[in-house]
């Protein structure tokens, strides 16, 4: 995997590599995500988007998108991370590469407020359409019937 990562670093000079407990994590700027993911899928065999999620770091004013990719033929796994501005979290949609990203991106939009330009139908998926806020953000406050 070392040669593979070195090749990616040559193609994407802003790519940061972090060793993980289980798999390496590639940290890439949001404007390079689509190009990196296209490379990983079309040229490196990572044909399966296992999942994506968002993590809220309010103390750092960022939301981190985390993607887990699998190469089924190559029996390999890799993690890709993107740090987003917490006030305006936005990262390109991956639905054109992996149609399964559709529902997962809608969930991240609904629960964390991340926008995905290029998504074919970005709208709430779990909360009602008139719901205010994003309930998985750490600063989200529940209101009781008494208003507290």
Curated annotation (Swiss-Prot):
What reaction does this enzyme carry out catalytically?
a quinone + NADH + 5 H(+)(in) = a quinol + NAD(+) + 4 H(+)(out)
Q: What is its EC number?
A: 7.1.1.-
The main location is membrane
The superkingdom of the source organism is Bacteria
Q: Which GO terms describe its cellular component?
A: plasma membrane
**Per its UniProt record, what Gene3D superfamilies does this chain match?**
NADH:ubiquinone oxidoreductase, 30kDa subunit (3.30.460.80)
Q: Where in the cell is it found?
A: Cell membrane
Membrane topology term reads: Peripheral membrane protein
Q: Which SUPFAM superfamilies match?
A: Nqo5-like (SSF143243)
Query: InterPro entries under this entry?
Result: NADH_DH_suC (IPR010218), NADH_quin_OxRdtase_su_C/D-like (IPR037232), NADH_UbQ_OxRdtase_30kDa_su (IPR001268), NADH_UbQ_OxRdtase_CS (IPR020396)
GO MF entries = NADH dehydrogenase (ubiquinone) activity; NADH:ubiquinone reductase (non-electrogenic) activity; quinone binding
Any transmembrane segments, and where? none
Note the Pfam families from the entry. Answer: Complex1_30kDa
Q: Does the keyword Hydrolase apply?
A: no
Sorted alphabetically, the keyword list is: Cell membrane, Membrane, NAD, Quinone, Translocase, Transport
What NCBIfam families does its record include? Answer: NuoC_fam (TIGR01961)
Function, as annotated, reads: NDH-1 shuttles electrons from NADH, via FMN and iron-sulfur (Fe-S) centers, to quinones in the respiratory chain. The immediate electron acceptor for the enzyme in this species is believed to be a menaquinone. Couples the redox reaction to proton translocation (for every two electrons transferred, four hydrogen ions are translocated across the cytoplasmic membrane), and thus conserves the redox energy in a proton gradient.
Q: How does it assemble?
A: NDH-1 is composed of 14 different subunits. Subunits NuoB, C, D, E, F, and G constitute the peripheral sector of the complex.
The text of the family note is: Belongs to the complex I 30 kDa subunit family.
| PANTHER family according to UniProt | NADH DEHYDROGENASE [UBIQUINONE] IRON-SULFUR PROTEIN 3, MITOCHONDRIAL (PTHR10884:SF14), NADH DEHYDROGENASE UBIQUINONE IRON-SULFUR PROTEIN 3 (PTHR10884)
Q: Can you name this protein?
A: NADH-quinone oxidoreductase subunit C
Q: What is the lineage of its organism?
A: Bacteria, Bacillati, Bacillota, Clostridia, Moorellales
Its gene is: nuoC
């Amino acid at each position: 995997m070392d040669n593979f990562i070195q090749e990616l670093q040559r193609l994407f000079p802003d790519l940061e590599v972090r060793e993980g407990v289980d798999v390496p994590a590639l940290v890439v700027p949001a404007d390079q995500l689509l190009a990196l993911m296209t490379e990983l899928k079309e040229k490196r065999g990572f044909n399966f988007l296992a999942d994506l999620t968002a993590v809220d770091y309010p103390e750092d004013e960022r939301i981190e998108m985390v993607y887990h990719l699998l190469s089924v033929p190559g029996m390999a796994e890799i993690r890709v991370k993107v740090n987003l501005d917490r006030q305006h979290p936005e990262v390109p949609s991956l639905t054109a590469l992996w149609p399964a990203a559709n529902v997962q991106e809608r969930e991240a939009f609904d629960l964390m407020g991340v926008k995905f330009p290029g998504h074919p139908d970005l709208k709430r998926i779990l909360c009602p359409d008139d719901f205010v806020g994003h309930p998985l953000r750490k600063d989200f406050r529940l209101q009781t019937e008494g208003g507290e």
